[in-house]
């Protein structure tokens, strides 16, 4: 899903680092997976991969399954992780993360 944007080895390393429940940290994940260093264009491409229902927003249910977008065998985020991730990214308080909010979150 991320071919041409992210390296498989980086994805594997980033997922391994947050295998344990409640160990997910979006800043660490985006850095390890190599997304923080990418161009605005690549970050946008990644957003549209994560936006599974193509609504133009990443909603709470999509955040919960965020890691599984990177690898089908990955765990779901815990409720606490999901809520913290949403709170960090949803700067306008509409309950979802838009493409511009996502870009800010990745570079945070």
Curated annotation (Swiss-Prot):
Q: Which GO terms describe its molecular function?
A: calcium ion binding
The protein depicted here goes by the name Parvalbumin beta 3
State if Acetylation is listed as a keyword: yes
Origin species, per record, is: Merluccius australis australis (Austral hake)
Q: Which GO terms describe its cellular component?
A: cytoplasm
What keywords sit in the KW lines?
A: Acetylation, Allergen, Calcium, Metal-binding, Muscle protein, Repeat
So where does Ca(2+) 1 get bound? 51, 53, 55, 57, 59, 62
Residues recorded as bearing N-acetylalanine in the entry = 1
- Quote the record's miscellaneous comment: Is regarded as an important allergen.
Protein's job:
In muscle, parvalbumin is thought to be involved in relaxation after contraction. It binds two calcium ions.
Keyword Zinc-finger recorded: no
């Amino acid at each position: 899903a991320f071919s041409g944007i992210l390296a498989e080895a980086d994805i594997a390393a980033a997922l391994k680092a947050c295998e344990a429940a409640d160990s997910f940290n979006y800043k660490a994940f985006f850095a390890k997976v190599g997304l923080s260093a990418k161009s605005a264009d690549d970050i946008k491409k990644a957003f549209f991969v994560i936006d599974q229902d193509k609504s133009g927003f990443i909603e709470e249910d999509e955040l919960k399954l965020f890691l599984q977008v990177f690898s089908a065998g990955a765990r779901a985020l815990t409720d606490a992780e999901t809520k913290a991730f949403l709170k960090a990214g949803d700067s306008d308080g509409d309950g979802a993360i838009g493409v511009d909010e996502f870009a800010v979150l990745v570079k945070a």
